[in-house]
């Protein structure tokens, strides 16, 4: 018996809505990354983008446990000597909660062309409203 290998043309994609209000950032991000990658499907193939589209709402109400709001830093470097910029997650979540969520998911996806394709299927919104009603997304209940 041969193993099934998905073709890019045969993949059927669904749309899901995830409500992140009151849930830990890492737990929501890991499950969203798994769906974007397609690991929830029996036809998962590692070298084919077989994931679904995900809409995340209420990104501003996501929670970080413990002292992570003040101790966890978002780091970026200008590539010049002494060019490290550190911002605590409290400021990041106040100013750009969508960016904080996208960064968490991006770091859980593969690096390279396939990972960038997967990340394009993620739509993150600050509030409860989104622009994708025409796609008829299903509400996705997270496992934990």
From Swiss-Prot:
One of its GO terms (molecular function) is mRNA binding. SUPFAM superfamilies: Ribosomal protein L13. Gene3D superfamilies: Ribosomal protein L13. The keyword Ion transport does not apply. GO terms for biological process: negative regulation of translation; translation. Pfam families: Ribosomal_L13. Transmembrane segments: none annotated. InterPro entries: Ribosomal_uL13 (IPR005822), Ribosomal_uL13_bac-type (IPR005823), Ribosomal_uL13_CS (IPR023563), Ribosomal_uL13_sf (IPR036899). Keywords: Ribonucleoprotein, Ribosomal protein. One of its GO terms (cellular component) is cytosolic large ribosomal subunit. It comes from the Bacteria. Part of the 50S ribosomal subunit. This protein is one of the early assembly proteins of the 50S ribosomal subunit, although it is not seen to bind rRNA by itself. It is important during the early stages of 50S assembly. Belongs to the universal ribosomal protein uL13 family. This is Large ribosomal subunit protein uL13. It comes from Clostridium perfringens (strain ATCC 13124 / DSM 756 / JCM 1290 / NCIMB 6125 / NCTC 8237 / Type A). The gene is rplM.
């Amino acid at each position: 018996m041969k193993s099934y290998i998905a073709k890019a043309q045969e993949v059927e994609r669904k749309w899901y809505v995830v409500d992140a209000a009151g849930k830990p950032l890492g737990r929501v991000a890991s499950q969203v990354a798994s769906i974007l990658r397609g690991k929830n499907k029996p036809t998962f193939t590692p070298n084919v983008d077989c994931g679904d589209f995900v809409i995340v709402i209420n990104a501003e109400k996501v929670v970080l446990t413990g002292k992570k709001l003040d101790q966890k830093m978002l780091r970026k470097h200008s590539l010049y000597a002494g060019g490290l910029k550190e911002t605590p997650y409290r400021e990041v979540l106040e100013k750009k909660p969508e960016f904080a969520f996208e960064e968490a998911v991006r770091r859980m996806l593969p690096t390279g062309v396939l990972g960038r394709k997967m990340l394009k299927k993620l739509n993150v919104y600050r509030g409860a409203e989104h622009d994708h009603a025409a796609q008829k997304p299903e509400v996705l209940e997270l496992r934990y």
